[in-house]
């Protein structure tokens, strides 16, 4: 089963002959949605930007990253524009090298892509001449009307998935709800020969938002986008699994540490075997890319990866109204404490008063006693 899971769709770098000098290339996909910069930032991350700043020529790399962000946001927000052509490619922005070499700016571009899962139109091809790096898009996304439809579909899908998790009390629960919802919605995409599909949309978020199927990039990018939207810190992870290129996620959970999640493998295996796993478990068959001289294998250093799997039993549950003594149970002990407070026999602490004032009127009286009693009897929540 695992042998059918592919890697990131990235073609090897090659040299072409454009208008001036030579153009280099490589290949894959990203998004376009509503005219809202807030939505873009809500679904994205700046983790890669921060890491690039720690590298040699970090300031120049961050400038290039910012220019790429600006260019992609402009294309997302302007569905009335087309794209230019350079050699055989569709381009929507040229980024000056600004002191960087081709490999360095390629690392910046792929880091930018990994931070922003919505940009389906940002192809994984690396193209540059002597003076500029070009941001390239697949033919499928040249028309503004196509991008407008894609953007609306992305917005609708991300927000609908996020709503399913909004009522959960912990980041672990939210991450699990989104994981399960994605795997209920999607199926792994194969071509007619039963090999992993290489259609552009199977390698970006549109596979989930429009088609209901995709390869590992689709699973990982939509998971990344929804968790970002829910303000759960996470990373798109690239590397190898069972010897083949693969993509998954690292998610920061309630204890402050990051854990790996592989929605793709869990979907194919019909299990939760790769949800909230630590380095010890995941390293048995997953190897994360590292900062490397090859742009196509370059990946930032991930922080705070737990060595062990997450233990959901250690999640501290939020204290409920009526739980006056904070023991996690609402019972006769809480009624006794409130009654003693009302009679002036034992005054509650300021913290405990917050949970004794069940109706939230700023007073602690017989009304609160009645409501706590109703909770105990199962007549109220």
Show where each model-derived region lies.
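Secondary-structure boundary elements
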Residues: 147-208
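Sec-exported extracytoplasmic/periplasmic mature domains
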Residues: 117, 159-166, 180-188, 224, ...
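Extracytoplasmic/secreted envelope proteins and their assembly/folding machinery
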Residues: 65, 69, 105-109, 151-162, ...
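Cellulosome-associated attachment modules in secreted, modular CAZymes
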Residues: 20-25, 313-381
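Sec-dependent signal peptide cleavage junction
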Residues: 5, 16-34, 381
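Hydrophobic/aromatic-rich core segments of domains that either
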Residues: 218-283
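N-terminal accessory/pre-domain segments preceding catalytic cores
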Residues: 24-170, 288-319
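Bacterial N-terminal signal peptides that target proteins for export
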Residues: 1-9
């Amino acid at each position: 089963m695992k042998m059918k899971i592919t890697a990131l769709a990235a073609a090897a770098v090659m040299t072409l002959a454009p208008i001036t000098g030579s153009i280099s290339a490589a290949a894959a996909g990203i998004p376009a949605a509503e005219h809202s910069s807030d939505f873009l930032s809500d679904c994205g991350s700046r983790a890669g930007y921060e890491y690039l700043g720690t590298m040699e020529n970090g300031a120049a790399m961050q400038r290039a990253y910012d220019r790429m962000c600006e260019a992609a946001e402009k294309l997302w927000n302007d569905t009335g524009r087309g794209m230019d052509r350079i050699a055989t490619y569709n381009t929507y922005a040229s980024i000056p090298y600004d002191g960087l070499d081709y490999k360095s700016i390629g690392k910046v571009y792929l880091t930018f892509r990994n931070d922003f899962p919505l940009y389906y139109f940002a192809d994984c091809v690396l193209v540059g001449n002597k003076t500029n790096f070009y941001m390239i898009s697949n033919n499928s996304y040249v028309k503004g009307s196509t991008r407008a439809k894609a953007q609306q579909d992305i917005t609708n899908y991300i927000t609908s998935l996020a709503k399913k998790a909004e009522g959960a009390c912990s980041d672990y629960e939210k991450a699990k709800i989104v994981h399960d919802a994605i795997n209920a919605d999607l199926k792994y995409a194969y071509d007619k020969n039963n090999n992993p599909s290489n259609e552009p949309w199977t390698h970006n978020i549109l596979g989930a938002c429009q088609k209901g199927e995709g390869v590992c990039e689709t699973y990982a990018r939509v998971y990344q986008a929804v968790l970002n939207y829910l303000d759960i810190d996470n990373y798109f992870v690239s590397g190898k699994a069972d010897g083949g290129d693969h993509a998954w996620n690292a998610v920061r959970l309630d204890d402050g540490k990051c854990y790996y999640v592989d929605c793709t493998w869990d979907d194919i295996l019909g299990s939760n075997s790769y949800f909230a796993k630590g380095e010890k478990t995941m390293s048995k068959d997953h190897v994360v890319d590292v900062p490397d001289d090859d742009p196509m294998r370059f990946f930032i250093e991930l922080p705070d990866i737990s060595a062990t799997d997450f233990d959901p039993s250690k999640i501290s549950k939020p204290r409920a109204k009526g739980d006056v003594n904070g023991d996690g149970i609402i019972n006769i002990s809480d009624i006794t404490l409130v009654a003693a407070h009302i009679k002036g026999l034992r005054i509650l602490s300021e913290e405990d008063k917050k949970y004794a004032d069940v109706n939230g009127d700023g007073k602690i009286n017989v009304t609160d006693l009645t409501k706590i009693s109703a909770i105990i009897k199962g007549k109220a929540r």
